[in-house]
Amino acid sequence: MKLCLTFLLVLMILASVTGEKSSKHTLSRAARVKNRGPSFCKADEKPCKYHADCCNCCLGGICKPSTSWIGCSTNVFLTR
């Protein structure tokens, strides 16, 4: 009987450590946050100082979408 209870306890701990039961909850929460978007970023065409100020990129002091395949680049040839 003790062996059976110990085995069940080990299974419960193992499931909680590996995230078996919480994976669906975590994924659904991540999807909701992604759809809502960050609440602290500025939309396109707003003034900015850093890339982190914008939802996309800060180029020339204005939030703009990235036009390069490598992300927010300030190189003239990559931002056209």
Curated annotation (Swiss-Prot):
Pfam families: Toxin_19. Keywords: Cleavage on pair of basic residues, D-amino acid, Disulfide bond, Hydroxylation, Ion channel impairing toxin, Neurotoxin, Secreted, Signal, Toxin, Voltage-gated sodium channel impairing toxin. Expressed by the venom duct. InterPro entries: Conotoxin-I_CS (IPR013141), Toxin_19 (IPR012624). Its main location: secreted. Residues 1-19 form the signal peptide. It comes from the Eukaryota. PROSITE patterns: I_CONOTOXIN (PS60019). The modification D-leucine is found at residue 78. The natural D-Leu form of the peptide is more potent than the synthetic L-Leu form. Residues 20-35, 80 form a propeptide. Belongs to the conotoxin I1 superfamily. Iota-conotoxins bind to voltage-gated sodium channels (Nav) and act as agonists by shifting the voltage-dependence of activation to more hyperpolarized levels. Causes circular motion, convulsions, copious urination, rigid paralysis and death upon intracranial injection into mice. Causes unbalanced swimming, swimming in diagonal and vertical motion and death, when injected intraperitoneally into goldfish. L-Leu and D-Leu forms are active on both nerve and muscle. The cysteine framework is XI (C-C-CC-CC-C-C). This is Iota-conotoxin-like r11c. It comes from Conus radiatus (Rayed cone). The lineage of its organism: Eukaryota, Metazoa, Spiralia, Lophotrochozoa, Mollusca.
